[in-house]
């Protein structure tokens, strides 16, 4: 018996292709380097590390400052705002005692918006344009933590700063109790008017040193220091100087603040 076998042409072709693949060689240029031979200089690594450290430090500082600002901003926004007023007698040293005198007395009214932040020890007063009195609208900040008072005369768009007078300005907690009583109707104040006179002195260049709340009030405004004259009760003769008048209250009596330039 004779065994006959045939060689497949396709099998020969596949074997030839495998040999060609095995014989392929990667040819690199003479100046090329192997990937594992590439080394980053130490100076570049160090510079990159410093950049990362400074970047993280700036980001952390921004987060801290931004958080502090947002806390004060939202604390300011969340404080309750009261719209209150008191009646006062302008042409007398005290309230009349008899009923006849009480009816004939000429009462004036001060109305204003008030906001108190007890935790920060700050009072905000906004005096609108009065209907009949010849006084200026104003925004006032009493900062008990900084022991400063700031007046923003809205007619002049100027700021004035003076040490806080705690003898006439109620502390935030007591003032808040007074406002709650006024709102509840248990205390309807009928009071008198106190006069105080301030003299404009030096200009303040850096309002950022006056604390967050006064900075918020006075930034971008011309800001001046004030010097207080002794508070006077009743009608007083005044010198012929250029004065602006602000009527407000932060106690059981009304206050007329004269801001004068000599």
Swiss-Prot record:
The keyword Cell membrane applies. One of its GO terms (molecular function) is amyloid-beta binding. InterPro entries: BRICHOS_dom (IPR007084), ITM2 (IPR040145). Glycans are attached at residue 165. The chain crosses the membrane at residues 50-70. GO terms for biological process: negative regulation of amyloid precursor protein biosynthetic process. Residues 71-262 are lumenal. It is a single-pass type II membrane protein. GO terms for cellular component: endosome membrane; Golgi apparatus; Golgi membrane; plasma membrane. Expressed in areas of chondro-osteogenic transition and widely in the nervous system. It is found in: Golgi apparatus membrane; Cell membrane; Endosome membrane. Keywords: Cell membrane, Disulfide bond, Endosome, Glycoprotein, Golgi apparatus, Membrane, Signal-anchor, Transmembrane, Transmembrane helix. The keyword Protein transport does not apply. It holds the Pfam family BRICHOS. Residues 1-49 are cytoplasmic. Its main location: Golgi. Disulfide bonds join 159-218, 243-260. Residues 132-226 form the BRICHOS domain. PANTHER family: INTEGRAL MEMBRANE PROTEIN 2B (PTHR10962:SF4), INTEGRAL TRANSMEMBRANE PROTEIN 2 (PTHR10962). Belongs to the ITM2 family. Plays a role in the induction of neurite outgrowth. Homodimer; disulfide-linked. This is Integral membrane protein 2B. The lineage of its organism: Eukaryota, Metazoa, Chordata, Craniata, Vertebrata.
């Amino acid at each position: 018996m004779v065994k006959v076998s045939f060689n497949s042409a396709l099998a020969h072709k596949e074997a030839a292709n495998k040999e060609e693949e095995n014989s392929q060689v990667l040819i690199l240029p003479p100046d090329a380097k192997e990937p594992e031979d590439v080394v980053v200089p130490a100076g570049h690594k160090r510079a990159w590390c410093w950049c990362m450290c400074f970047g993280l430090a700036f980001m952390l500082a921004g987060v801290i400052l931004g958080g502090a600002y947002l806390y004060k901003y939202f604390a300011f926004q969340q404080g309750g705002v009261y719209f209150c007023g008191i009646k006062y007698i302008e042409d007398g040293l005290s309230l009349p005692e008899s009923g006849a005198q009480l009816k004939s007395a000429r009462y004036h009214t001060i109305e204003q918006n008030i906001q108190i932040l007890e935790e920060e020890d700050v009072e905000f007063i906004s005096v609108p344009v009065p209907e009949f009195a010849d006084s200026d609208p104003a925004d006032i900040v009493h900062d008990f933590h900084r022991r400063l008072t700031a007046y923003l005369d809205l007619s002049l768009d100027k700021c004035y700063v003076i040490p806080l007078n705690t003898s006439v300005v109620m502390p935030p907690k007591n003032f808040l109790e007074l406002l709650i009583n006024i709102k509840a109707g248990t205390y309807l104040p009928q009071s008198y008017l106190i006069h105080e006179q301030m003299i404009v002195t030096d200009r303040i260049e850096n309002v950022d040193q006056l604390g967050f709340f006064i900075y918020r009030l006075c930034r971008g405004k011309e800001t001046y220091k004030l010097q207080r004259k002794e508070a006077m009760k009743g009608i007083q003769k005044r010198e012929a100087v250029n004065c602006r008048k602000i009527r407000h209250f932060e106690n059981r009596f009304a206050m007329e603040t004269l801001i004068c330039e000599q």
